[in-house]
Every structure is written in C-alpha cells, then in structure tokens.
C-alpha cells in the first residue's frame, strides 16, 4: 500500500480504455457509402459465404461491415447506416449494417425478431 506522500508525488494512473469501434467516433451510428459489396469465408471451424461490404464513412474511415439477414439489396454507392458490433468468425469485421435504414431494405418474409432486421409488421 502506498503512503500519502507517495500518492501526492505520484498519483495513481487511470487505465485508458481503447474503443472497440473507433470509426464511430463516440456516436451510436454513422452513415456511409458502400465502396465494395462481396462475400468472404469465416475462420476455421465454421464454413459459409458471409455477406460483407466495404463502407466509406462520414468520419472519413473505411471499414468492413457485416450485412445480416437473408438476402440484401446493397450494391456499390448504396448509402447505409453502420452500428457497432463485431462478427466473431470474420477477422476485421467490427461493424454491422442497420437493416431497414437509408438504402438498405429489411429482410423479406421475416416473422420473428423483425426489429433487428428492419421488417414491417405483417398484415395478419
């Protein structure tokens, strides 16, 4: 345990927490323009073709973001909304595209968990 005089001369350092989503610049979401839309394969135990997009943000960052849900309408020059949230089996993908916002359509024929995929309530 440090003495009072030791703490006066050399105060305790606050640990600096590094942001997991630096491109958002402390905002909840950011707008961006797709520069490339493509598929990529996940890390070792998993196997799939994951849909991702390279996005140029208004904060001047270029990030890779994941397109969740089945099917999408994104192409180059689509304007999208980005939120934080990494994809564990895709290295370097630390952002998600928000479905149902700006140029991104919601997922068709989705019944459960609709709010996560920008789907309107079905006509009963």
From Swiss-Prot:
Subunit record text: Part of the 30S ribosomal subunit. Contacts proteins S8 and S17. May interact with IF1 in the 30S initiation complex.
Modified residues (3-methylthioaspartic acid): 89
Family, similarity comment: Belongs to the universal ribosomal protein uS12 family.
Gene name of this polypeptide: rpsL
Cysteines joined through disulfide linkages: none
Protein name per UniProt: Small ribosomal subunit protein uS12
Functional description taken from the UniProt entry: With S4 and S5 plays an important role in translational accuracy.
GO biological process: translation
């Amino acid at each position: 345990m440090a003495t009072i005089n030791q703490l006066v001369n050399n105060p305790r350092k606050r640990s600096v927490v590094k942001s997991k989503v630096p491109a958002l610049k402390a905002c909840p979401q950011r707008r961006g323009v797709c520069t490339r839309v493509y598929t990529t394969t996940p890390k070792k135990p998993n196997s799939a073709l994951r849909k991702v997009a390279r996005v140029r943000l208004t904060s001047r960052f270029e990030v890779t973001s994941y397109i969740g849900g089945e099917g999408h309408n994104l192409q180059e020059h689509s304007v999208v909304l980005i939120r934080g949230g990494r994809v564990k089996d895709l290295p370097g993908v630390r952002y998600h595209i928000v479905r149902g916002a700006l140029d991104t359509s919601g997922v068709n024929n989705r019944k459960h968990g609709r709010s996560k995929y920008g789907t309107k309530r079905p006509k009963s």
